[in-house]
Amino acid sequence: MHALLTRLAERFPDAVLAVREEGPYKDLVAQVKPAAVPEIARFLHDDPEAAFDMLSDMLAVDYPEDEDRFEVIYLLKSLPRNHRLRLKARLPEDDPTIPTVTTVWKGANFLEREVFDLMGITFAGHPDLRRILMPEDYDEGYPLRKDFPTEGRGWRSTFPFLPRLDEPAAPMASEVPEDQHRPFLKEAEGLPKDTKAVRRQEELLLNMGPQHPATHGVLRMVLELEGERIVKATPDLGYLHRGVEKLCEGLAYQQIIPHTDRLDYVCSMTNNYAYVRAVEKLLNLAVPPRAEYIRTVVAEMQRIIGHLFWLGTQALDIGAMTVFFWTFREREVLLDIFEKLCGARLTLNYYRIGGVDSDFTPDLVQRLGAFLDTFPAHLHEYDELLLTNRIWLARTKHVAVISAEDAVNFGCTGPVLRGSGVAYDIRKAEPYGAYDKVEWEVPVGKNGDTYDRYWVRLEEMRQSAKIIRQCLAQMPEGPIIADAPQIIPPPKQKVMRDMESLIHHFIIFTQGFKPPKGETYCSSEAPKGELGFFIVSDGGPKPYRMKIRSPSFVHLGAFDHMARGYLIADIVTIFGTYDVVMGECDR
Amino acid sequence: MDMLVFAGASVAKIAVVMVTVLITVAILTLAERKVLSWMQDRMGPMEVGPYGILQPIADGIKLFFKEDIIPAGANWVLFSLAPIISLIPAFIGFAVVPYGPNIEYELYGVTIKPFIISDINIGILYVLAFASIGAYGVILGGWASNNKYSLLGGLRAAAQVISYELNVGLAIIGVLILAGSLSLVTIAEKQAGGFWHWNLIGGLQIIGFVVYVISSVAETNRLPFDLPEADSELVAGWMTEYSGMRFAFFFMAEYANMILVSCIASVLFLGGYHAPYPGTLLPGILGYFEGVAWFTVKVYFFLFLFFWIRATLPRLRYDQLMRFGWKVMLPLALANIVITAIVVYVLR
């Protein structure tokens, strides 16, 4: 038994119901009483040996047959100790209430709202418990509960809160109905309607998005302004919510891979990678070395694409339009390589459970080498336009500053966290693929401002190029997919010729494979941050519950904290610096 | 009879200048897209006509036939008036710009200067005055749209125009001291005889030139000073609610303003229609057109500079713009005045 679990059980003999190490990877799990969660969370956060300073993710699982129907799971991560813990609490159906942990981890704010929204669990003491992904006046229940049909309840025309397209629009006295006036001004609530004197009159409520040139998709931001200065920024998410987690509960494990492409559509390969790694972890399946190298190379190519895309759009938001076109020029080269590799350019689907779909061809390796030869010169071109540009410095230095402590507390990961000076990179902390076999460094910033995050991302592109080069040099010969006939179908050529292989193929694709009963959380370093998949398996061919830990969603939880006090012009800089992709954020 | 001849000649000159300016605006819309494209490794418009040269015509037709929308909450009088207020001052300024040599013809007893519409002795003051009126179009357009983004754009425009117009005015005072006149013709004439006589080099108006160029970029709301428009922050700033021809008016005004400030810059600092060498190479009447050609080259140099800056620099933030205007540009312009005044006083 892990020392930490013993310590926890001894410290809270009444509140901790059970501690155990689960699965082949010995995940630490602690089952606790719901009422004691804040106390235990505080202990786990403060205790120097536990030091769980980050709440990676939280979710709820619905077990309708059980006595205590809901299980709330907190996925904790300790950066100094580099270990993880799953904290679980069971809640009954008639009173699904649990105290909030926002007092311990500020990042829990959005995560708890999501659990409330999708599973209907109330968090007592939460400062702002509203729906987050579904519309605020959504009245049809909680979508992730098992008794909610996958196809949804009703359709567009049956929801009274959505405007009908076939009827003339109802006349409205003003754009905002009277009773919804200023719903974002929490302080004004509970006061008689005519007491306006509590707030100064100069404040301007500006609605930014969901249709706005700089919101990178369909993010809506309600800004309270004093002149051009931001007093409060309230992100409104969910315009791109497609219920991927619910959909995945109805799909076999292989069928989910294409759905992960559509999460972060800028870096679809990374999502594929994160997902197949989670399934492999669940299956405890070893991947052949050549496949690991290929996966690493492709993931790093995707990281370069993601960062190029980010650099272009961030620069465009700030007004430097040339960088945008130049980065897209380089991105195009890599997309062509992807097209050679798997036939697609945007929603790529190359990773397979247990390996990859096809091998590198010599032509592809040669093209990739040619790209790597010219890439440093191109990076230098961007540097010439931006790195020492006075206006660029003025627009990014000391803008959207977040301290290392706050960044960790909000659950920020990836370049956002590293820009604040925390050298946390999952590729180093929990190595996977071929990352532990090549030489590379984790760039970290100092001040946690937009410029540092810009610098970190540019440096990461250089490191990625370095990783790809080494991987190509070291790449061993061998199979590209694991030898596990229970899980992996035979190669297509054999299927077309050989009767037994055809049957084998048919069985896997009609019945799926059945991983052992259990749970697993597996995180990967996506260009945006920590992309994690939490899968609960009931032993069937479909996941019982799948939760996606999306870095963009967690980062937007810190938006208000980072935006307050800056000017309207900085809002677009802050949007850009997170590198949000709403497909991943809203899922 | 005299009046008739004078009026006829003036109308003819106005017609030529207006047509030239409008054609230049059309050329600029294409040139800007082409120049930016080449700087950004792409081709720009290629579909309409060979190499996309008919693109401005297609754009014009499109804008002309677009639906004209006035938002429900807008003040329609000011909303319709704003593009006109923007456009007219932009065109009116060209009346005092000398395009070619200062020659005079006798036509039925009336003296006519063919290369300038009207040589009034306060030419530069006239240009500055009308440039300020143009700003009202932006402010009113932003206010009348009844849109928060437009309002913010309009407010930014007001602040920006006030700050930078001051700098434009102060930057050219050095030139005025050297020329001893407010007439653009006189200023140009004083710079005759080769590039070492130009105000930029011979008059050592380098600070004034730099301040003027930067401030005029700001005054025309171009990157990196396009805060009133700021497409990534304020959607399109004061133009957010405008469409069709009203939008085209604002657009034309912006480009006409660019041409105007380029014309003024070349007259004030680069000798206007004077070639960089003394006299002209071509004899007689062709020599006049040599001057016009040199003037055109200088104006296009400035216009190219606008595009070049746009392709290179990010946008400033509002507070940085203000700080830059008041704390950097203004002291520089004042220093330029003081130095020029002292030097001129000592040398005379």
Enumerate the predicted regions with their spans.
Chain A
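Metal/cofactor-centered catalytic core regions of large enzymes
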Residues: 164-587
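Terminal low-complexity/charged segments
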Residues: 1-229, 388, 392-394, 399, ...
